[in-house]
């Protein structure tokens, strides 16, 4: 029966297969399968036809760790640069699966606490087991005792004991032992500040109201119109307030200023160290001055009290008494290129060091000496280029302007602790292309900005204004020699530029100034006219080294030159009033501040010449060698504004202080019954008297 069923099933299957083949319309031969028959492939009409080489070509696939879904163009705002910046690096991490685990590290605090709790639970379970085992042992021991008691009770009649009471006491003892837990040993935690957070409901702090009584703030009604004059008045009031505050600051004593500064500053470790050093330096300065005062006591006594008694026997001759000699090792073999007294502190003077030799240019030095300490300068500044000139501001005596050999100008602030100039010109700000031979402070401009002038060999007279934190330049005039235009092949004309060497501004006429050149000419110029000169003087045959207006007489000026001459001029006349030949190149001249007829000149042969036109208008009343003739050459001279002394500098970096004898500073003699007249009017009349004599002689000739 089973074999027949299997056949029927197979027959039915083959019949069903034949029916399917007939239905599909495919002819299948006997003994073959469907999969072995060939099938026709169908291709789309736009399919690419590739060659065998293209089909066999291998393409390498590179797997990268970059996230394909990461953004490519993220832009964020940069507060530093103030613009939107493209973010180049983007985090490429992609999270595929994350699961929060419940494993705790053994070394962590939570792991230690859990381990400690497990040990506590295990210890309590062991103690319970020990207590139960002891209780069972006690019960087993009591059972035979009870049997023995019953036998004895049965044997001994009449001897009955209180057995139930004893049983109750034993049960109570067992219960107490079972109920008393075994206390494990306390283990100290490694961190006693461990705590577990527990949530609890607490009552929030209730709001409290506090009230107080006070006077209401005052109220005012204000109304005004904003117009031009109201704004101007407000600015004027503000300016007055600022000036008052400045005056208060100036009126404060230096000790109070120092205490306020020390209170305002927050001292760091470095600042405290620097303050300690400054305190030590101040103390060292005081000690140094005391030592020098004792060392140079005889010189100080001569400076104050000594007068040459031999002048009583010499009517028209005087002498120079050497006092102090100033020198510094760092400025050794650097020529003294400039001298200037401080207008406020009469014992302080500034010295500029550089070199006049074109082939031996080196560094420069700015030194400020005090007569109280001749051994070492009070201030010292160094520069990469040689300093050729300097000037100290009249109203701000801590500001020193200097001119360099490389054409730059700079301003030094003596109040600043650092050794660099506060302001300096650059090639972008219009610096000179040749050495700067002289600088002069002038009055502030309309906006109260500091202003000074400079002259250079490039032929430019430049006005420099300190606006905020930079130097702004304006070319006042360019020196052009007359009749010096040359034509070049292209048809253009070239003007020969004059080389300025010295200049000086008029004391009363603000716009007028004189300029000396290397060609020996002196030009009278104006700040208002930049295209032409007011007048031209054929002064010298060689370069003009100095030009100076007389401090008393407004028409008289003096010039000196390398042609050995010193000339005194009236600016209204083109010929000189006085000419003096000193038999050597004249480096510098200076008017005396106490007389309109006294001036000094220094020559390269090491001599200092002092003239007094009221005593002798033909020759010097003092002609004295100051330095060694063969070794040193005197370059500059300056009178002290108050004391009867002069300072001279040489080309070796030495500065010598000399005292004028009484004959070199004679005052008008007293006449019987008349008071001695003093003042500028007397000095002007004294010089006018001499000039009138010269004018009369010239008119006669």
Swiss-Prot record:
Subunit structure, interactors included: Consists of at least two heavy chains and a number of intermediate and light chains. Interacts with BICD2. Interacts with CFAP45 and CFAP52. Interacts with CFAP53.
Compartments reported by the entry: Cytoplasm, Cytoskeleton, Cilium axoneme
Signal peptide feature range: none
Family: Belongs to the dynein intermediate chain family.
Start and end residues of each stretch annotated as Disordered: 1-45, 119-165
Name of the protein: Dynein axonemal intermediate chain 1
Transmembrane segments annotated in the record for this chain: none
Biased composition (Acidic residues): 136-155
Modified residues (Phosphoserine): 124, 127
WD repeats mapped onto the chain: 382-422, 431-474, 539-579, 581-621, 629-668
GO terms of biological process kind: determination of left/right symmetry; epithelial cilium movement involved in extracellular fluid movement; flagellated sperm motility; heart development; insulin receptor signaling pathway; outer dynein arm assembly
Pfam families linked to this entry: WD40 (PF00400)
SUPFAM superfamilies, alphabetized: WD40 repeat-like
Keywords, ordered alphabetically: Cell projection, Cilium, Cytoplasm, Cytoskeleton, Dynein, Microtubule, Motor protein, Phosphoprotein, Repeat, WD repeat
Main localization, broad class: cytoplasm
Function: Part of the dynein complex of respiratory cilia.
């Amino acid at each position: 029966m089973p074999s027949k069923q299997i056949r029927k099933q197979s027959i039915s299957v083959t019949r069903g297969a034949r029916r399917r083949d007939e239905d599909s319309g495919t002819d299948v031969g006997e003994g073959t399968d469907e999969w072995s028959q060939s099938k026709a492939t169908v291709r789309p009409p736009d399919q690419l036809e590739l060659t065998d080489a293209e089909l066999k070509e291998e393409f390498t696939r590179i797997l990268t760790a970059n996230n394909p879904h990461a953004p490519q163009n993220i832009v964020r705002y940069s507060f530093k640069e103030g613009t939107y910046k493209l973010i180049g690096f983007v985090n490429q991490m992609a999270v595929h699966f994350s699961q929060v685990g419940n494993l705790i590290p053994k070394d962590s605090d939570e792991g230690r606490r859990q381990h400690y709790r497990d040990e506590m639970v295990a210890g309590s379970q062991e103690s319970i087991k020990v207590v139960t085992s002891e209780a069972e042992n006690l019960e087993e021991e009591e059972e035979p005792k009870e049997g023995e008691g019953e036998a004895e009770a049965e044997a001994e009649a009449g001897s009955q004991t209180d057995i139930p009471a004893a049983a109750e006491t034993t049960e109570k003892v067992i219960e107490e032992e079972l109920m008393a837990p075994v206390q494990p040993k306390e283990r100290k935690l490694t961190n006693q500040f461990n705590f577990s957070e527990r949530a609890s409901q607490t009552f929030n702090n209730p709001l409290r109201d506090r009230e107080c009584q006070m006077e209401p703030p005052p109220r005012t009604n204000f109304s005004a119109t904003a117009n031009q004059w109201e704004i101007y008045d407000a600015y004027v009031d503000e300016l007055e307030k600022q000036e008052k505050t400045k005056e208060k600051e100036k009126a404060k004593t230096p000790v109070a200023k120092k205490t306020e500064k020390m209170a305002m500053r927050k001292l760091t470790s470095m600042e405290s160290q620097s303050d300690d050093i400054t305190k030590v330096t101040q103390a060292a300065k005081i000690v140094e001055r005391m030592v020098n005062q004792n060392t140079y006591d005889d010189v100080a006594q001569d400076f104050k009290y000594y007068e040459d008694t031999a002048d009583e026997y010499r009517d028209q001759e005087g002498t120079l008494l050497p006092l102090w000699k100033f020198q510094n090792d760092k400025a050794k073999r650097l020529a003294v290129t400039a001298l200037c007294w401080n207008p406020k502190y009469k014992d302080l003077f500034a010295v500029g060091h550089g070199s006049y030799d074109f082939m031996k240019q080196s560094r420069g030095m700015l030194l400020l000496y005090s007569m109280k300490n001749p051994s070492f300068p009070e201030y010292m500044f160094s520069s990469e280029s040689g300093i050729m000139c300097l000037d100290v501001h009249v109203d701000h005596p801590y500001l020193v302007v200097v001119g360099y050999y490389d054409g730059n100008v700079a301003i030094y602030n003596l109040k600043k602790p650092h050794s660099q100039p506060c302001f300096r010109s650059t090639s972008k700000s219009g610096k000179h292309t040749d050495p700067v031979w002289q600088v002069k402070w002038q009055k502030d401009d309309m906006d109260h900005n500091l202003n000074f002038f400079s002259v250079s060999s490039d032929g430019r007279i430049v006005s420099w204004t300190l606006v905020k934190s930079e130097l702004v330049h304006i070319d006042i005039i360019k020196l052009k020699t007359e009749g010096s235009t040359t034509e070049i092949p292209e048809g253009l004309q070239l003007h020969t530029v004059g080389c300025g060497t010295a200049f000086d501004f008029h004391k009363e006429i603000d716009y007028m100034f004189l300029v000396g050149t290397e060609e020996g000419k002196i030009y009278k110029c104006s700040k208002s006219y930049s295209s032409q000169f007011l007048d031209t003087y054929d002064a010298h045959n060689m370069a003009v080294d100095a030009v100076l207006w007389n401090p008393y007489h407004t028409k008289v000026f003096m010039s000196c030159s390398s042609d050995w001459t010193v000339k005194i001029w009236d600016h209204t006349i083109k010929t000189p009033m006085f000419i003096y030949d000193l038999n050597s190149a004249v480096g510098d001249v200076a008017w005396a501040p106490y007389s309109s007829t006294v001036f000094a000149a220094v020559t390269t042969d090491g001599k200092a010449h002092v003239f007094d036109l009221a005593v002798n208008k033909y020759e010097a009343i003092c002609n004295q060698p100051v330095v060694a003739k063969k070794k040193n050459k005197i370059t500059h001279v300056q009178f002290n504004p108050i004391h009867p002394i002069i300072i001279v500098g040489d080309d070796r970096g030495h500065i010598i202080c000399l005292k004028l004898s009484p004959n070199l500073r004679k005052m008008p003699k007293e006449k019987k019954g008349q008071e001695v007249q003093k003042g500028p009017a007397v000095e002007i009349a004294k010089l006018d008297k001499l000039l009138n004599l010269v004018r009369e002689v010239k008119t006669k000739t």
